[in-house]
């Protein structure tokens, strides 16, 4: 049976010791979906939001969040990320925005939490910038899409 890596033999939370692990190229992709009204999405896409470019702001927020994941998630290691990418795609037919991230490094631990944090904070930034015009925006389906590198192997999520 697989065990929780962040719990020691006394049942206490602790940071995993990665000092003996080999450095490998590690990559993770994540996504989040933000659902809003047709009018709110149109305002964003047409550049008519009074706060400015919502997607550019969300992209930068997601990148910044990935770089600071270790400050937000208590047992995450500080990582020297070599790449962080955040893409936002308006899905006009469903009044949604698909946010996807890619995080990459050569190191001793994975970058899943950084990828998940990137999409989460990008989604929260969209909500923050749009809450004045719509309060019932929904953030959903925050999930890991893919990870590679390390001894746990390659993971690819099932399509939804």
From Swiss-Prot:
Keyword list, A-Z:
Lyase, Molybdenum cofactor biosynthesis
Keyword Aminoacyl-tRNA synthetase assigned to the entry: answer is no
Q: In which pathway does it act?
A: Cofactor biosynthesis; molybdopterin biosynthesis
| Gene3D superfamilies xref list | Molybdopterin cofactor biosynthesis C (MoaC) domain
Tell me the SUPFAM superfamilies matching this sequence: Molybdenum cofactor biosynthesis protein C, MoaC (SSF55040)
Per its record, what are the GO molecular function terms? cyclic pyranopterin monophosphate synthase activity
Q: One Pfam family name from the record?
A: MoaC
Q: Quaternary arrangement and interactors, per the entry?
A: Homohexamer; trimer of dimers.
| Purpose | Catalyzes the conversion of (8S)-3',8-cyclo-7,8-dihydroguanosine 5'-triphosphate to cyclic pyranopterin monophosphate (cPMP).
Please identify the protein, giving its name as recorded.
Cyclic pyranopterin monophosphate synthase
Q: Which organism is it from?
A: Haemophilus influenzae (strain PittEE)
Q: Which gene encodes it?
A: moaC
């Amino acid at each position: 049976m697989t065990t929780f890596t962040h719990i020691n033999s006394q049942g206490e939370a602790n940071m995993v010791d990665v000092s003996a692990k080999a450095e490998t190229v590690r990559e993770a992709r994540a996504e989040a979906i933000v659902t809003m009204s047709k009018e709110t999405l149109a305002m964003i896409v047409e550049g008519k939001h009074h706060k400015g470019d919502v997607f550019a702001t969300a992209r930068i927020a997601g990148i910044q969040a990935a770089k600071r994941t270790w400050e937000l998630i208590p047992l995450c290691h500080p990582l020297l990320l070599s790449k962080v990418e955040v893409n936002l795609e308006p899905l006009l037919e469903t009044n949604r925005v698909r946010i996807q991230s890619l995080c990459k490094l050569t190191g001793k631990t994975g970058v899943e939490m950084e990828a998940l944090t990137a999409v989460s904070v990008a989604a929260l930034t969209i909500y923050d910038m749009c809450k004045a015009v719509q309060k019932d925006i929904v953030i959903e389906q925050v999930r890991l899409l893919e990870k590679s590198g390390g001894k746990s192997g390659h993971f690819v999520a099932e399509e939804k």
